[in-house]
């Protein structure tokens, strides 16, 4: 199994999710199952079957999160050699050469990616094109609608 790169923030979010699943969701669903069982015949007890189905989802998610946590490689960008290069965890401001529009992205792990928040996966075409480049470099991103050329305006280790 391969390691899963993750920022410090991403690791904390995943750890918090696991705690909530184990300490809130799991006990709640067990209580729901006990309550539904008390209603009698389990064959036609929709409440019971729904609770058991939810229990399956919760237990599956717990296993998935535990697996990710066991394989995660936490990368603290503030402790990296800050040589100005685009690497995992850096926040990069780009200017589209064609229309002079600016965009800022943070390169994060797969599970943390959220384009609306400006967080892109380290495996995305944009991140792949940016890796290793530095302020002032022009980078060509192969996008579905065609090549897009950006200038790297800044690289921050925050």
UniProtKB/Swiss-Prot annotation:
PROSITE patterns: GREAB_1 (PS00829). GO terms for biological process: DNA-templated transcription elongation; regulation of DNA-templated transcription elongation. It comes from the Bacteria. Pfam families: GreA_GreB, GreA_GreB_N. Transmembrane segments: none annotated. GO terms for molecular function: DNA binding; RNA polymerase binding. Keywords: DNA-binding, Transcription, Transcription regulation. Necessary for efficient RNA polymerase transcription elongation past template-encoded arresting sites. The arresting sites in DNA have the property of trapping a certain fraction of elongating RNA polymerases that pass through, resulting in locked ternary complexes. Cleavage of the nascent transcript by cleavage factors such as GreA or GreB allows the resumption of elongation from the new 3'terminus. GreA releases sequences of 2 to 3 nucleotides. HAMAP family: GreA_GreB (MF_00105). NCBIfam families: greA, PRK00226.1-2, PRK00226.1-4, PRK00226.1-5. Belongs to the GreA/GreB family. This is Transcription elongation factor GreA. The gene is greA.
């Amino acid at each position: 199994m391969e390691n899963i790169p993750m920022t410090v923030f991403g690791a904390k979010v995943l750890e918090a999710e696991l705690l909530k699943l184990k300490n809130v969701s799991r006990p709640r669903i067990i209580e729901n199952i006990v309550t539904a069982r008390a209603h009698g015949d389990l064959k036609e007890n929709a409440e019971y079957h729904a609770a058991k189905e939810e229990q399956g989802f919760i237990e599956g998610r717990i296993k998935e999160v535990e697996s990710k946590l066991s394989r995660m490689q936490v990368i603290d960008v503030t402790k990296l050699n800050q040589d100005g290069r685009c690497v995992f965890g850096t926040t990069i401001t780009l200017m589209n050469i064609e229309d002079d529009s600016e965009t800022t992205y943070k390169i994060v792990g797969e599970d943390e990616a959220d384009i609306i928040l400006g967080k892109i996966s380290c495996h995305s075409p944009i991140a792949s094109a940016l890796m290793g480049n530095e302020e002032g470099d022009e980078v060509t991103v192969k996008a579905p609608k065609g090549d897009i050329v950006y200038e790297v305006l800044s690289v921050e280790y925050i």
